[in-house]
Regions:
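Phosphate/dinucleotide-binding and metal-coordinating scaffold of catalytic cores
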Residues: 1-287
């Protein structure tokens, strides 16, 4: 693991802002096999009317701040991929190593954070490694695919799940941009509809013993009948016996990004402490 400090410039770009604005700097500190993260607001951001509480561990004052009993801040973990997206990134790193006869690269939180395609990144935080550089990741080789490509996307996800040893370059080329930004463990991808709106397609998994897409759609219908507001959802049977579940991205309105933070972040929890503490909806109500 490299030693020293690595800075990432954090920008806010949510609905109502005329342009992205520097919020502060996320610093990764590496040393003696350990890593820690700190965040410091930009002095101009503290004065702006756009500020809001983005994480209970990041309060409205200047100077370096550090997460409470956690390695990293929850709000930045929310901007990273979860199991499926990380699987894609690891498979890509392994494929690159095989092609060039190298040792596979070990991926860290910074790699996951900056490896997400900026256009489809969840939420409204954006990241740079230099102020005059591009928002990362800026690899436009694989644009968000149209709805018409859903059969190919589902086939790619199935191939990656089915065999750890296949030549994955073709399938990764199809899935990296649309799939690496998303959380959760299930195979999924971003797609764009005929109006240009982003959706998430959640594919059947090889481990499914029931039609989870159909059950998720039923939960959506029950939520609507209960008065809960949700973005539009659909199901389609693309291939095989189970449905693919589609949900319109809740963090987008046209080209506008909408900021969000997970319940885990805003209640001050983490994956680690939830191993020893059972969270509930009461925690959300108290927040």
């Amino acid at each position: 693991m490299k030693q020293g400090k690595f800075d990432i410039y954090v920008f806010a770009d949510w609905k109502g802002m005329a342009a992205p604005k520097l919020m502060g700097i996320l610093s990764a500190h590496y040393g003696k096999g350990k890593k820690a993260f700190g965040f410091e607001y930009d002095k101009d951001w503290i004065k702006t009317a756009s500020q809001r509480l983005i994480d209970p561990d990041i309060q409205f004052f200047s100077g370096a701040q550090f997460p409470n009993n956690k390695e990293n801040f929850g709000v930045f973990l929310d901007s990273m991929p979860d199991t499926w997206g990380r699987t894609l990134m690891k498979r890509k790193a392994a494929q690159h190593a095989r092609e060039f006869g190298e040792k596979p690269q070990t991926l860290y939180d910074i790699d996951y954070l900056l490896g997400v395609f900026d256009k489809t990144r969840m939420g409204a935080l954006r990241f740079k490694t230099s102020l005059d550089g591009s928002f990362l990741d800026d690899d436009h080789e694989n644009a968000t695919p149209p709805w018409s490509s859903i059969r190919e996307l589902q086939a790619a996800a199935k191939n990656l799940e089915d065999d750890e040893n296949i030549d994955v370059k073709k399938w990764l080329a199809i899935l990296m941009a649309p799939g690496s930004s998303l959380g959760g463990a299930r195979p999924k991808a971003n797609i764009v509809d005929e109006k240009g709106d982003l959706w998430i397609a959640k594919f059947p998994s090889k481990n499914d013993t029931i039609d989870k897409g159909a059950w998720e759609f039923l939960a959506y219908q029950l939520a609507l009948k209960s008065g809960i507001e949700m973005n539009e959802c659909r199901i389609e049977k693309i291939a095989g016996k189970h449905h693919t579940f589609f949900t319109k991205r809740f963090d987008r309105e046209g080209e506008d990004r909408i900021h969000f933070a997970s319940a885990m972040t805003m209640t001050g929890n983490s994956e680690e402490n939830l191993r020893f503490h059972t969270a509930s909806y009461l925690d959300i109500a108290e927040f």
